[in-house]
A protein has these predicted regions:
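Short, well-formed alpha-helical segments that are part of the catalytic scaffolds
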Residues: 15-31
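Donor nucleotide-sugar binding loop of glycosyltransferases
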Residues: 15-19, 47, 105
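Cell-envelope/extracellular polymer assembly enzymes that use nucleotide-activated donors
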Residues: 5-7, 39
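Short beta-strand/loop segment that forms part of the nucleotide-sugar
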Residues: 35-47, 67-68
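Membrane-embedded multi-pass helical conduit in multi-pass membrane proteins
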Residues: 230-288
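Catalytic donor/gating beta->alpha subdomain of glycosyltransferases that bind UDP-sugars
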Residues: 170-229
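Acceptor/aglycone-binding surface of glycosyltransferases and processive sugar-polymer synthases
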Residues: 70-71, 76-85, 94-97, 103-179, ...
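A conserved acidic beta->alpha catalytic loop
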Residues: 44-53, 102-103
Length: 288
């Protein structure tokens, strides 16, 4: 039986030390699975630091391709551009999308790819069952999960770490909404199978995300569900009218917060929506 193509897509911005460590661990873990020709697609998000990819002989990785974006656009758009490139350049393949900092553990790839091969109509998502951040960060994350669920009725406890057959890419890229958040586009447009894994430890340095970045990312995840959010907020308002009609203050605050949320989501959409992925960010292709 002919080996099937499997391409691991990794967005990178400046963190080349982590990428090199990740490639070593990916190569080691891929030895556990047979029947696949494994390749790596690195989407360089216009890094300002010198590109350093150590050319080692990888027994289980046949090719490494570097996609150099002309301008920095963030990991979510970088993933969308990478998927768009794969969709137009290859046919009948498997893809694993993962971050390059070590938090997505390479040891999970074999399990995810095996499931993706068995269930080709599904996207396999790696959900975090235990987080190692501070209590404050975990609290914020849980607030985000609950907030998103109450607005969208979707429990989005996974990030970029996903595996799937190539036929799912057209759904993920539907209406170019994956540029907001890969996870939201997956759960909105695809059937998913959840697996659960511990979050890995970053190889080097700490995350540069601050509180405002986390809030914006939470809003980006919700942006794909704007129509549903409008509907759910109306339903909640009807509930308030029935049970709290005498409390003008509650109604006023709720209306204000609802419209404030609509405005924030509108601004996020305006900032991040890409009308045409193929024309948005020109790139240079380089084989390592």
């Amino acid at each position: 039986m002919k080996n099937q193509k499997h391409i691991i897509l990794i967005p990178v911005y400046n963190d080349w030390n982590s990428l090199n460590q990740l490639l070593l661990e990916i190569n080691s873990n891929l030895a556990q699975i047979k029947g696949f020709k494994n390749e790596i697609l690195i989407v360089n998000d216009s890094s300002t630091k010198k590109i350093i990819i150590k050319k080692k002989k990888f027994d289980n990785i046949e090719k490494i391709t570097l996609l150099n974006l002309r301008k920095n656009c963030g990991s979510q758009k970088a993933i969308a551009i990478g998927l768009s490139y794969l969709n137009t350049s290859y046919k009948n393949f498997f893809t694993t999308v993962m971050d390059g900092d070590g938090e997505d553990q390479p040891s999970e790839i074999v399990k995810m790819l095996t499931l993706a091969n068995k269930f080709k109509d599904y996207v396999i998502t790696s959900n975090r069952k235990k987080r190692k951040e501070s209590i404050f960060v975990r609290l914020l994350y849980n607030i985000h999960l609950i907030f998103t669920f109450l607005l969208t009725y979707k429990w989005i406890s996974f990030g970029n770490f996903t595996s799937f057959y190539s036929s799912n890419i057209k759904n993920i890229l539907y209406d170019n909404q994956s540029c907001f958040a890969h996870s939201s586009s997956v759960i909105k447009n695809c059937k998913i199978i959840r697996i659960y894994a511990k979050r890995g430890k970053r190889y080097f340095d700490n995350s540069n995300l601050n509180l405002l970045d986390l809030i914006e990312h939470s809003l980006r995840i919700n942006t794909l569900f704007l129509k549903r959010i409008i509907l759910t907020t109306i339903i909640y308002f009807i509930f308030i009218l029935i049970f709290f009609n005498k409390f003008l203050f509650i109604k006023t605050i709720y209306i204000f917060l609802s419209f404030f949320l609509y405005i924030l989501i509108y601004l996020i959409r305006k900032k991040h929506l890409i009308e045409n992925l193929s024309r948005y960010n020109k790139y240079q292709i380089k084989l390592i």
